[in-house]
């Protein structure tokens, strides 16, 4: 395994990037396809560690699927119902939250005996709000080690009914409930306690459910009504749009050191909230052009930003890097859920930004970033977090080199990231 990657100073950014499929959409649509009536042909599926964990789990559950085109096309043979296993199994899901949470819910419908576990970091990521909600709906679940964290044993039994869910930590808990509630015996009312984070990710879920023939009643994200005893119907073919979070690095590179960059696979018609990253770049001064399925960013003088970024939590990490190249102190707010991602991203970003010379103030749910007077060469710890590696690659646009430790962590979502980044990089 490669210990580090040193990126030399890049003098200019220019080119076109064809985005891999969205991770958020890929794992959702794989699960929906497995539970739907009929065969679904998925194209532009993301080929990454996280999708492999989902596919491996579906195979172990008994779902038939066939991969082609370098694992980006997948024919999924749906079973037309929730999963019911005749024998106990264990599923290892690494650090893939988009597999762990929805699969736990899906396996909590019929009577089952399944243990879901992951790597060390997954066992530090809270899951109590989802477990509590499933128990309210009649499911039987047990923590196998620490209370509130995976691994978790589910024995099934979720029937629906009235459920109170804390929405303040992760939208994936709500996504998981929404996706399985139509298959429950009873109607389900989900009432949200607290402020729901990352609402655009819920919009992705609702959009996908609609594509598979299921609609729900959304009362301003305060409550959700889902009719029970429904069935998902395969749409036949489904094209996974490009990953908007992955687009952020290339758009940011153009804003900092363009030239221009065109990202193909997301645009005005995208269902992902992270496309609003381009709006933030525009507010900072970058020049943005939109198409139905592409975004173009051109360099311009960048100014500080002071924004609530709860709606783009993953792409907001890239804004923290862009802020290093802007005039003035930028403040990124309402990002507490960074702390329960692949690593504690607030703490990690704070430490690594200081290494390159930035003045950082870290709050419970915010980050203040003052650009360096001059950039310093640094070895960047990635904390086995793919987004840390991709974000800090942009430091090479500062006129100095940067060394990224454990660069292979990008395989979680974007194995070819560095290859693509170098394609649009120009060197003196």
Curated annotation (Swiss-Prot):
Keyword Transferase: yes
Active site: 314
One CC-aspect GO term: cytoplasm
Primary localisation category: cytoplasm
Catalyzed reaction equations: 3-phosphoshikimate + phosphoenolpyruvate = 5-O-(1-carboxyvinyl)-3-phosphoshikimate + phosphate
GO molecular function ontology, one term from the record: 3-phosphoshikimate 1-carboxyvinyltransferase activity
Residues annotated as binding 3-phosphoshikimate: 23-24, 28, 170-172, 198, 314, 337, 341
Keyword list, A-Z: Amino-acid biosynthesis, Aromatic amino acid biosynthesis, Cytoplasm, Transferase
SUPFAM superfamilies named among the record's database cross-references: EPT/RTPC-like
Pathway this chain belongs to: Metabolic intermediate biosynthesis; chorismate biosynthesis; chorismate from D-erythrose 4-phosphate and phosphoenolpyruvate: step 6/7
Quaternary structure and interacting proteins, as annotated: Monomer.
Name the record gives this protein: 3-phosphoshikimate 1-carboxyvinyltransferase
Originating organism: Buchnera aphidicola subsp. Schizaphis graminum (strain Sg)
Gene transcribed to yield this protein: aroA
């Amino acid at each position: 395994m490669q210990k580090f990657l040193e990126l030399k100073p890049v003098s200019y950014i220019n080119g076109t990037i064809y985005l891999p499929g969205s991770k958020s959409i890929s794992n959702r649509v794989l699960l929906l396809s497995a539970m739907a009536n009929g065969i679904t042909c998925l194209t532009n599926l993301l080929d990454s560690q996280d999708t492999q964990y989902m596919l491996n789990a579906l195979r172990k559950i008994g779902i038939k699927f066939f991969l082609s085109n370098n694992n980006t096309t997948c024919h999924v043979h749906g079973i037309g119902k929730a999963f019911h296993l005749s024998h106990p199994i264990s599923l290892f899901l690494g650090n893939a939250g988009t597999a762990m949470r929805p699969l736990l819910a899906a396996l909590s419908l019929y009577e089952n005996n399944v243990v879901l576990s992951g790597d060390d970091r997954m066992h530090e990521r809270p899951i109590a709000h989802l477990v509590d909600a499933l128990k309210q709906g009649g499911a039987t679940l047990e923590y196998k080690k620490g209370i509130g964290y995976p691994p978790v044993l589910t024995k099934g039994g979720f029937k629906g009914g009235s459920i109170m869910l804390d929405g303040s930590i992760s939208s994936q808990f709500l996504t998981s409930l929404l996706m399985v509630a139509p298959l429950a015996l009873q109607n389900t009312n989900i009432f949200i306690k607290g402020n729901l984070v990352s609402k655009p990710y819920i919009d992705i879920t609702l959009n996908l459910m609609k594509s598979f023939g299921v609609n729900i009643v959304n009362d301003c994200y305060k409550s959700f009504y889902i009719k029970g005893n429904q069935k998902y119907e395969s749409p036949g073919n489904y094209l996974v749009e490009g990953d908007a979070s992955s687009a952020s690095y290339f758009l940011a590179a153009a804003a900092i050191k363009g030239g221009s960059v065109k990202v193909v696979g997301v645009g005005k018609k995208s269902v992902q909230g992270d496309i609003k990253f381009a709006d933030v770049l525009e507010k900072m001064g970058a020049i943005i052009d939109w198409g139905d399925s592409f975004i173009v960013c051109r360099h311009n003088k960048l100014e500080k930003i002071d924004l609530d970024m709860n709606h783009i939590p993953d792409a907001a990490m890239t804004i923290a890097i862009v802020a290093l190249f802007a005039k003035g102190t930028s403040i990124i707010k309402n990002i507490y859920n960074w702390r329960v991602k692949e690593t504690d991203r607030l703490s990690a970003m704070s430490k690594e930004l200081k290494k390159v010379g930035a003045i950082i103030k870290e709050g419970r749910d915010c980050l203040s970033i003052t650009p360096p007077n001059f950039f310093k060469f640094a070895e960047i710890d990635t904390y086995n977090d793919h987004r840390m590696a991709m974000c800090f690659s942009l430091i090479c646009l500062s006129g100095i080199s940067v060394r990224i430790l454990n660069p292979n962590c990008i395989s979680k979502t974007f194995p070819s990231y560095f290859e693509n980044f170098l394609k649009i990089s120009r060197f003196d």
